[in-house]
Structures are given as structure tokens and as C-alpha cells.
Curated annotation (Swiss-Prot):
One of its GO terms (molecular function) is xenobiotic transmembrane transporter activity. Belongs to the resistance-nodulation-cell division (RND) (TC 2.A.6) family. MdtB subfamily. This is Multidrug resistance protein MdtB. The gene is mdtB. PANTHER family: MULTIDRUG RESISTANCE PROTEIN MDTB, PTHR32063.
Length: 1040
């Protein structure tokens, strides 16, 4: 039995080396747990980091923006403003619609927020208009979040009113019940109704008014309790023909008698089956349709929600007539799956490249198999922990695993290389494994914990960016930790069983040639290192220059927030002159649709015109452009957008604003372009003065493009200026005037038709076909106190004025949003700085405040914390290394490698034309953890040589550099090749992955070249500093 020296006991690895069966079974258990975890993990585009968001919609047909603001929005806002945990409240009040978006703190559960919203709505009920057709309705959805699925329902044989009725009752309700669905909206406005169009001349000739008609209809159509009869032996329920169901029944309704003869509704009005709101329309491509948009709840998994919808659709469509066709126009999960699949492929490529580089260096199949087992085992085992932490398989976690490929192989390489060295010296494999693993154990622990220390600050990042990268950091840390365990257990055990002197010495022609090549490289490195050590101050100046260059590059490199992704869907806003009518806007929309559908990259188009919960005014339209899959089109989304805008510019009288949909949605409202900047004031007058001035200035900036604001104060208003004294003499109140106008022009919902499946409305309005425009006001008649009929024109004058088409609030104060994009040659950082400089030149009054919103605000926050994040990572690593080495000096030597990584990463981003965004910054932080391993391996062996062999510091560090040159080169190339697939990524979602790969590859290349020379020099300089300090202390003690 061989007696091993104490130094060769194997340390923590001994138990696993000596018990191969137990070690193998333990690793099999990790593998099985990881496989089970992988199958159980949900799939998503990004980690679920949505703010809890609730949208409250109140519809009041016929109400002006001013009435909606004062009568509906303001009372609700006052109640919502008292809720705890509310982060931001924004509202939009337009003609007939109030939309309030409530964004809560990340820490507040959505269900709790829902309860608070419902309580606030209940408290505001008594403050809202008594004739509000429906109470406020809330949905757990972020309106700025694009729908996860868009469906178009069309029919060649049925009217759209019947189609919408069937979709609403048979399809939309069922989809709404699916877990994860936050809101199902039907765009197209074809809800069935009975429309009563009064003939103003006919009722005037008969001495009637619209109020007489309204009262007659509401009194004739009721549906209330009537009681029952309870006799000695039988109980009888009472019922009556109090409901009118069809247009024909309403035509026959008697509304008055004159000279004993009945006047029926059909005599004074056109009564027909129609749509509840005739100023709404939706189209799928060029065909009128009911468009169904499905939005998810904040925090819901998009893939599982879409899968549930897909599974239910065949069953739902079977319940519809054959002539009704349901088409899935867009499904965001298609691109998400493609992006995740591409990332998984890049992960497999990284593993293959890493194994290839191992074989290139070790030139031995058994030695290659060992890390070839360790790498996938470490990665697969990570899935088990991810399930326990409620993570998902998404682009960021897969990117973490791809990067981890280069990390986790480091530990195995270091162990194998050290054990192989002892076997080549003649040691038995078992003894070599015990000795090599024991010797390298501390290095593995140092590498692991110092690398994890770099990730710790990521866990404490605040707000949504911190939530976003928490899964990334923890996934990477778990993979690194499992890798360390595998490298100290399975790897030395396999080395003891699979490696031998014969296998290591067995060489073919390739092995001999590559060995000679490596020997020449090491010899050349040794000669270069000797020269460098003879000129330490020159080398130190190079190191300081890299630090200075890093700072300069950091200042001047273009900065961004989050890469703009190509998800194959473009959201658009079409803007026409502010006085445009529904019919005019619908015509313009069809012209634009024709142009867009001619583009070869466009697959389908949905568009919507009218005022509802998403569209604020009649002069705007919403579009969703669905592009062909990436492999079926030649251009990326930004080029398609530029091409479409150029084509639509030829359509007169419209402006088209386009932006690609993104997986990360921070905004709370649908804006015209990608980025937002707000002006908030205490009054609308202040905004009307300063918004046009600021917009004009911003439109002149070269750093901005597509600058526009949602401030529209030139909407035409017919102001009815009532002579109150004259009206009072006639016994006419302002309520009478409002009612008469509402009856005539408000599409007033005056009664409800109840059926077993749904409820439908009776809509009252004037027939204005023969009296268009302001002339229609001359037909209004009111009833005086003596029963006479009085023309409105006798007590009022009509004035044409201008007023806002919508009134927006942010946290209860008036606000306007300025939207903008950037040209290709400018970054978000350039745009933000230009806006801030322009704002200063305007000298805005103190009652106007400005703030960036959405992703621009998040960019500012992330940019402000980035430097502190990097400093925190460096400090955390210094603390860990100081504890491990029991030294204040050696951690500084190790950390001196960091500027070289920064220079390499920033130069690579600059050359590639990539911005320094959040993804790239994460790459730089990871580089901090990677590049210091070169110094750790050098310093560990140098300290051991000084301590055990009595070498001088210069000889020790020189020998350590030559001994560790091969594993340093091997591990660096492994990390580089692990990041290379990300850098070369071209598939779906490549925009998200590429900055990480570019930064890491650039940083690794530069740091590999420089740290091999700068680290030994800095090690010796600090060693001399330590000796000088000790001698100074010793001299002071002697003198004392």
C-alpha cells in the first residue's frame, strides 16, 4: 500500500476520489434532478419583472374631454391617489372615454393592488355622473404591453354586428377565463344595438322634442321585478310583456297622441338594427373585421398563456357558423420560442467549442472526456435549482448558462492540468489525483468565490433592472458553484481512473506538432516576460495607460438602455389633422394600409379607428404590422420601419409613427415612438404656451427624430352660449339644454334590452344626414314651462372654438408627453443629454416640471448606478480575496488586471458600433470576475514556491507564469469561445445577446495579452512595497 505524504492527502477531494461509486451516483442524481427541472421549467422571453399594473376604463358616450376629466377622471384619481404602494398614476380623458393606468411598486402583489382599486372605485361611485351607462371597469393589464395574440374574425355572409355578438359571448369570455389572460378587447365597435335616428323636422312639426321620445322609450322598455302570488295551494310568478327586443317593436311604440291619433316612433324616426357605436371600425389587412387582442396579466407567463389559448381555439371556432373565419394574425410567442431556440443552439455551440479547445490543448481523448462530462453536468444541474427558485428558461438565463460554459470548464481544466503534470512526472494516477487535487483545491475555491462575489452587486440592483438581472446572476452563480463541486469531486475521481502515463504519453503526429508549437510559444513568452521584468516601470506605465484609456472610453462611448429587439411586430400610430372625422380618418387609414401591405416584409396588418380605451381621438388610428419571419425577409425591423415611413410620406394629410414591440415594457401608455419625455404643469394654459416651443426646439436637434407630442389643442368645438336669463323666463334649465344636445348628438344609450345571453342597448340620436355640421344645431327644440316648443337658437348662440382633443394627467396634474426616436448615428445617451441642454435654454417657469418616462427614465437610473455597481463588484471581490489570502496587498495585485478587460470590452463595442447598454455593462462586470483568474493562478503558485521552495519573489513569479501559462491560455480561450456564439449571433433576439458576447470577447482578448505581463510586474512592485513598509516599521521600533 502506497503511503502518501501529508501534502498529498487530497483535501476535500479525497473522500470522492477514494469512493468512485458513491461519487458517480451523486453526479447521476444531480443529472437526473437537472433533467427533471428542465422539463418543468416554463419558457419566456425574459424574466417576469412587470410592475403590478391595473387599467381602469370608464365610457361616457357623448361627453367632451373636459367633462370626462372633471366629472369622471378627477373623482377617481382622488380616490386612487390615497392607495398605498402606488408608484405612478396616469390618465387620459378624451371624448367619451376615461382611461386611468395605475402602476404599483414591484413589491406589492397584484391581487392586493386589485383589492385596493376595487375599494377606491366603490368609494368614488357617488361622485360619478348619475347617467353613466356603466360603472368603471378595471383590468389587470398594462396598456403599453403589446398583445400576446391578435385574432381577426371575419365573415362573408353575416353582418359584423352578429359576428361581434357571437365572438363576445362564445369566444372572448372563454379566452378571458384562461389563467394569465388580463384583458380581451374587441376592436371594431360592431356591438349589436337598436338605433333610433330622430327626424328633427318631423318631431318639430308635431310639437315634440327628443326628450319626449327618450322618456317614452325608457318607460316602454323595462325589466324589473313584479312579484308573485302565493295562494292556498299554488304559487304563481308574475310576468309581463315589458321588454321590447327588436327594431320593429320599437317602430310600433306609441310615443304620444295628437287629436286622438297615435304617433308612433317609426313616424318620427328611423329605427334599425345597427352597431352600438357607429364611430368605431377595425380592419384585418383590407377586410373589415372584429379584431380580438389578448393581453396578459403582469407577471403571467406568456408562453403557457398562449399555449392555453391555442389549445382552446379549435373548440371555440367549432361553435361558430361555417361562414365565420377566425385567423391568428400575430402570436408573440412564435418569436419568443425562436429566440429561445436560437439561444439554446448557441449554448450547445459554446459547449462544443469549449470541448474542442480542451482537446486542442490536452491532445488526449480521456483527458478531454473528463471536462466534457463536467461542463454539461454543471449546466444541467443548474436547472434543478432554477425550478426551486421559480425561474424560467428565457434569453437571460440561457445567456448566463452560455457564458457559464467558459466559466465552469475553468475549474475542470485547472484540476486536470495539475493532476496530468504529476502523472507525467511519474506519479501513479491515484497518488497524482490526490496530490494534484489537494494542491489546487484552494485555487478552485478562490476562483469560485471571487467570481461569485462579482455577481453579488447584481442581486442588490434596484427597481426593474435589478429584478431583470437577478435570474441571470443567480443562474450563473449556481452554475459556477456546481462546477466547483464537480471539479473537486467527479473530476479528480475520473482523473484517477482514466488518466495514465501511457495515455498521456501516447502521441500522434498532430499531438507532437502541437506540443512543439506550445513549447515554442511558452519559450517565447518566457523570453518576453524576462525582458518585461527587467523594465518594470515601463510595464507599469502601460498598465496605468489602460486605466486612463478605460476612463476615456467610458466617457465617450455611446450609451443606451436596452437593445432594440426585432420581434417581428411593429406598433403604429396614424395621425391626421385634429378636426378629422371618423369617416375621413377611416378613408385615410385604408390608403395607408394599401401602401403598407405592398411592402415585401409585411405579412399582415390590423388597424383601428375611433375612440375607445386605447385610441384617444378620432383623428388618430392604431396599427399593428406583423412582419414575416426573420428568415423570410431581407431586412431587420428598423430598416422596414424606415422604408414604410418613407412610403407613407406620399399619402397626403397623415403622419405615421412606428416602433417595434419589445419584450421588456416599462411604459404605462401606448406612445407614438420608442422614448418619452413629459412636461407637467398646474394648468393646461401653461402647457399650451410651452409645449409647442419645446417641441419646435427638439425637432431641430440632430440627435432626435420623429419628435411629436400628444398635445392637441386645436380640436373644433361648437360652444353653445346659452342666454340664461332668456332660458329662465321660458322655464328652460341648463339640464334641459344638455339633455337635448345629448339626445341628439351623443349616441345616447337610453335603454337596455335584456336577453338570456347578453344585454344590448337602445341608442338615441338625431339623423343628421340632411343637416350636416353646425346646421344640425338649428334643429334642436326644447320644451318651455307652458308646454310650448322653443328652438335652441332662440336662447343660445353657437360659437366655434378650439379645445384639447384629450386631457392627460400624471399623478393628478396636467401633463403632455413628447415622444422621440434617434437617428442611427446617435445613442439614447446623446438624445437625453441634448434634451436636457435644450430644456435649460428655454428657462421654463417653476410651475412646469419635466421628467423622462418609461425606458428613458430607467436608462437614467441604470446609468447613474452603473459606476457604483462596478465599484461594488470590485470591492466585493477585494473583500473575498483579502479574506482568502489573509492579505491586503495580493488582492490589489489580482484586481490590477481589471482595466485591461475594460479597455478591451469598450474598444470592441466601439469597433462593432454597439452601444454601452445594460447588457454590455453586465458583460463588463462578468469580465471583472473572469480576468482576475489569470492573476490568481499566477499568484497562488508564486506564493507556494516562495513558501515551500524558498524561491525569491522574482524567480517564484517567473516560474509560476511559465507553469500556469498553458492552463491560463486554455481557460481564457474556453471563456472566449463560450462567448463567441453570442457575439456572432444572427437569429431572432440576436440584438439582445450580441452586446454581451462582443464585450466579453474583446475584454478577454486584450486582457489575455496584457495581464500575462503586467501581473508579474505589479506582483513584484507590491512585494518590494511590502518589504519597504516592514523595514520602516522595524526601524521605528528599534529607535523607540
Amino acid at each position: 500500500m502506497q503511503v502518501l505524504p501529508p501534502s498529498s492527502t487530497g483535501g476535500p477531494s479525497r473522500l470522492f476520489i477514494m469512493r468512485p461509486v458513491a461519487t458517480t451516483l451523486l453526479m447521476v442524481a444531480i443529472l437526473l434532478a437537472g433533467i427533471i427541472g428542465y422539463r418543468a421549467l416554463p419558457v419566456s422571453a425574459l424574466p417576469e419583472v412587470d410592475y403590478p399594473t391595473i387599467q381602469v376604463v370608464t365610457l361616457y358616450p357623448g361627453a367632451s374631454p373636459d367633462v370626462m376629466t372633471s366629472a369622471v377622471t378627477a373623482p377617481l384619481e382622488r380616490q386612487f391617489g390615497q392607495m398605498s404602494g402606488l408608484k405612478q398614476m396616469s390618465s387620459q380623458s378624451s371624448g367619451g372615454a376615461s382611461v386611468i393606468t395605475l402602476q404599483f411598486q414591484l413589491t406589492l402583489p397584484l391581487d392586493v393592488a386589485e383589492q385596493e382599486v376595487q375599494a377606491a372605485i366603490n368609494a368614488a361611485t357617488n361622485l360619478l355622473p348619475s347617467d353613466l351607462p356603466n360603472p368603471p371597469v378595471y383590468s389587470k393589464v398594462n396598456p403599453a404591453d403589446p398583445p400576446i395574440m391578435t385574432l381577426a374574425v371575419t365573415s362573408t355572409a353575416m353582418p359584423m354586428t352578429q359576428v361581434e355578438d357571437m365572438v363576445e359571448t362564445r369566444v372572448a369570455q372563454k379566452i378571458s377565463q384562461i389563467s394569465g389572460v388580463g384583458l380581451v378587447t374587441l376592436s371594431g365597435g360592431q356591438r349589436p344595438a337598436v338605433r333610433v335616428k330622430l327626424n328633427a323636422q318631423a318631431i318639430a312639426a308635431l310639437g315634440l322634442t327628443s326628450e319626449t321620445v327618450r322618456t317614452a322609450i325608457t318607460g316602454a322598455n323595462v325589466n324589473s321585478a313584479k312579484g308573485s302570488l302565493d295562494g292556498p295551494s299554488r304559487a304563481v310568478t308574475l310576468s309581463a310583456n315589458d321588454q321590447m327586443q327588436s327594431a320593429e317593436e320599437y317602430r310600433q311604440l306609441i310615443i304620444a297622441y295628437q287629436n286622438g291619433a297615435p304617433i308612433r316612433l317609426g313616424d318620427v324616426a328611423t329605427v334599425e338594427q345597427g352597431a352600438e357605436n357607429s364611430w368605431l371600425g377595425a380592419w384585418a389587412n383590407k377586410e373589415q373585421a372584429i379584431v380580438m387582442n389578448v393581453q396578459r396579466q403582469p407577471g403571467a407567463n406568456i408562453i403557457s398563456t398562449a399555449d392555453s389559448i391555442r389549445q382552446m381555439l379549435p373548440q371555440l371556432t367549432e361553435s361558430l357558423p361555417k361562414s365565420v373565419k377566425v385567423t391568428v394574425l400575430s402570436d408573440r410567442t412564435t418569436n419568443i420560442r425562436a429566440s429561445v431556440n436560437d439561444t439554446q443552439f448557441e449554448l450547445m455551440m459554446a459547449i462544443a467549442l469549449v470541448v474542442m479547445i480542451i482537446y486542442l490543448f490536452l491532445r488526449n481523448i480521456p483527458a478531454t472526456i473528463i471536462p466534457g462530462v463536467a461542463v454539461p453536468l454543471s449546466l444541467i444541474g443548474t436547472f434543478a435549482v432554477m425550478v426551486f427558485l421559480d425561474f424560467s428558461i428565457n434569453n437571460l438565463t440561457l445567456m448566463a448558462l452560455t457564458i457559464a460554459t467558459g466559466f465552469v470548464v475553468d475549474d475542470a481544466i485547472v484540476v486536470i492540468e495539475n493532476i496530468s503534470r504529476y502523472i507525467e512526472k511519474g506519479e501513479k494516477p491515484l497518488a497524482a489525483a490526490l496530490k494534484g487535487a489537494g494542491e489546487i483545491g484552494f485555487t478552485i475555491i478562490s476562483l469560485t468565490f471571487s467570481l461569485i462575489a462579482v455577481l453579488i452587486p447584481l442581486l442588490f440592483m434596484g427597481d426593474i433592472v435589478g429584478r431583470l438581472f437577478r435570474e441571470f446572476a443567480i443562474t450563473l452563480a449556481v452554475a459556477i458553484l456546481i462546477s466547483a463541486v464537480v471539479s473537486l469531486t467527479l473530476t479528480p475521481m475520473m482523473c484517477a481512473r482514466m488518466l495514465s502515463q501511457e495515455s498521456l504519453r501516447k502521441q500522434n503526429r498532430f499531438s507532437r506538432a502541437s506540443e512543439k508549437m506550445f513549447d515554442r510559444i511558452i519559450a517565447a513568452y518566457g523570453r518576453g516576460l524576462a525582458k518585461v521584468l527587467n523594465h518594470p516601470w515601463l510595464t507599469l506605465s502601460v498598465a496605468l495607460s489602460t486605466l486612463l484609456l478605460s476612463v476615456l472610453l467610458w466617457v465617450f462611448i455611446p450609451k443606451g438602455f436596452f437593445p432594440v429587439q426585432d420581434n417581428g411586430i411593429i406598433q403604429g400610430t396614424l395621425q391626421a389633422p385634429q378636426s378629422s372625422s371618423f369617416a375621413n380618418m377611416a378613408q385615410r387609414q385604408r390608403q395607408v394600409a394599401d401602401v403598407i401591405l405592398q411592402d415585401p416584409a409585411v405579412q399582415s396588418l390590423t388597424s383601428f379607428v375611433g375612440v375607445d380605451g386605447t385610441n384617444p381621438s378620432l383623428n388618430s388610428a392604431r396599427l399593428q404590422i406583423n412582419l414575416k419571419p426573420l428568415d423570410e425577409r431581407d431586412d431587420r425591423v428598423q430598416k422596414v420601419i424606415a422604408r414604410l415611413q418613407t412610403a407613407v410620406d406620399k399619402v397626403p394629410g397623415v403622419d405615421l409613427f412606428l416602433q417595434p414591440t419589445q419584450d421588456l415594457t416599462i411604459d404605462t401608455q401606448v406612445s407614438r415612438t420608442q422614448y418619452q419625455f413629459t412636461l407637467q404643469a398646474t394648468s393646461l394654459d401653461a402647457l399650451s404656451t410651452w409645449v409647442p416651443q419645446l417641441v419646435e426646439k427638439l425637432q431641430q436637434l440632430p440627435q432626435l427624430s420623429d419628435v411629436s407630442s400628444d398635445w392637441q389643442d386645436q380640436g373644433l368645438v361648437a360652444y353653445v352660449n346659452v342666454d340664461r336669463d332668456s332660458a329662465s323666463r321660458l322655464g328652460i334649465s341648463m339640464a334641459d339644454v344638455d339633455n337635448a344636445l345629448y339626445n341628439a348628438f351623443g349616441q345616447r344609450l337610453i335603454s337596455t334590452i335584456y336577453t338570456q345571453a347578453n344585454q344590448y342597448r337602445v341608442v338615441l340620436e338625431h339623423n343628421t344626414e340632411n343637416t350636416p355640421g353646425l346646421a344640425a344645431l338649428d334643429t334642436i327644440r326644447l320644451t318651455s314651462s307652458d308646454g310650448g316648443v322653443v328652438p335652441l337658437s332662440s336662447i343660445a348662440k353657437i360659437e366655434q372654438r378650439f379645445a384639447p382633443l384629450s386631457i392627460n394627467h400624471l399623478d393628478q396634474f396636467p401633463v403632455t408627453t413628447i415622444s422621440f426616436n434617434m437617428p442611427d448615428n446617435y445613442s439614447l445617451g446623446d438624445a437625453v443629454q441634448a434634451i436636457m441642454d435644450t430644456e435649460k435654454t428655454l428657462n421654463l417657469p417653476v410651475d412646469i416640471t419635466t421628467q423622462f418616462q418609461g425606458s428613458t427614465l430607467a436608462f437614467q437610473s441604470a446609468l447613474g448606478s452603473t459606476v457604483w455597481l462596478i465599484v461594488a463588484a470590485v470591492v466585493a471581490m477585494y473583500i473575498v480575496l483579502g479574506i482568502l489570502y489573509e492579505s491586503f496587498i495580493h488582492p490589489i495585485t489580482i484586481l490590477s488586471t481589471l482595466p485591461t478587460a475594460g479597455v478591451g470590452a469598450l474598444l470592441a463595442l466601439l469597433i462593432a458600433g454597439s452601444e454601452l447598454d445594460v447588457i454590455a455593462i453586465i458583460g463588463i462586470i462578468l469580465l471583472i470576475g473572469i480576468v482576475k483568474k489569470n492573476a490568481i493562478m499566477m499568484i497562488d503558485f508564486a506564493l507556494a514556491a516562495e513558501r515551500e521552495q524558498g524561491m525569491s519573489p522574482r524567480d517564484a513569479i517567473y516560474q509560476a507564469c511559465l507553469l500556469r501559462f498553458r492552463p491560463i491560455l486554455m481557460t481564457t480561450l474556453a471563456a472566449l469561445l463560450g462567448a463567441l456564439p453570442l457575439m456572432l449571433s444572427t437569429g431572432v433576439g440576436a440584438e439582445l445577446r450580441r452586446p454581451l458576447g462582443i464585450g466579453m470577447v474583446g475584454g478577454l482578448v486584450v486582457s489575455q495579452v496584457l495581464t500575462l505581463f503586467t501581473t508579474p510586474v505589479i506582483y513584484l512592485l507590491f512585494d518590494r512595497l511590502a518589504l519597504w513598509t516592514k523595514s520602516r516599521f522595524a526601524r521605528h521600533e528599534e529607535e523607540a
